[in-house]
Amino acid sequence: MEFLLFLVLLIINPVVLCGLLVLFFSYLRRIKNERKYFRTAINNDFFEGRYYIKNALKFGFLNSIITMLLGVELTKQWIFVYMGIMAVGIILSFYVDLNSILLLVFTGGTIGIASLSLFDEKMVIPASLQSFAEIKPGIIFLILTVFYLTKLSMLKSYKQDFFQPKIYNGKRGRRLIRYSLRDQTVLPLIVLVPGNLIHSLIPVWPILSLGGQSFTLFVLPLWISWTLKLWRNSVEMELQKAKADTQQKLVITIIGTILGLWFPITGIFVFIILLLLVGLRFVQRYAKMKRKGKWYAETHDGIRVVAVRPETPAAKMNLEIGDVIIMCNRIHVTTESEFYEALQKNSAYCKLKIRTYEGQLKLAESAIFADSPHEIGVVLFR
């Protein structure tokens, strides 16, 4: 019965529903843009929603075990303010991803308020902020640890199918492609809230008694999102850099959790280190955007692979975005029409000569079945 109530609370949680709704509208926008630029939807599947629910249940369950074992305690005022801020952030995520900024500002503010009373016990904290001052810095760092740990786990499942292409006009008349990945989920984290917050509304909801104090189990919706953009970098390199960056932040939050629980006064200093790392990575990324590199651009020495539709002959041949098809069935191709004509030379089999984004040559081949899509699933410049 209690487990069913947990599932009901997860499903009707407004933040979870808001995230799923925004993700659905983002899916509709993706399909619209793909049909606008390429006259076809690259992937009609609403995979965003499937991964949203899958990640929420899997990582929510695993991380809830951690929060329950460590007895994560949050005040109801903190939770409600957090839920309101994250709900606004999720709505705005249709246009801009503010997930990390909002979380760092909110958690940093909480650690700052808690640190005021730690540095000066005589300092009077306003009544409206008292519930924030009661939260230990180590608990806040634990939430950040769950945040970065989940982001790192989500990152490992990403592949080129998740990156969406968009066409831009270059300065020299060539058309360029920018790839972007946007993904999000909301984890249902079980935390402890002093008092009978839910029990007063749902009498059968369990209450825990620890140290002579009553606690209510509450599901905290932890919003987690990813936004990655590619201009002049390969998918593999971008994912590797994002992984290394997230691992560094994760290490800092783990250290902050340990020190914050045993030596709360150190929390503000560890958080400053985290902010410095975030700022440094932002500056480095901006500086890199100004450097020279290979664009995903239209070419006259073959045809550029803009995207690969899943479960097609092109996907079976392991074609990657940025590849340049030089030959098809031993015929040189430089335009879409030439590529299509070369495919007609052998309607049952296709053999390609390809130059990768890094400049290496490779061969790829695959059988073509009767139900294979036009142009074997390769999306080209139109």
Please place each PLM-identified region on the residue numbering.
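Membrane-helix interface "capping/anchor" motifs
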Residues: 91-105, 230-240
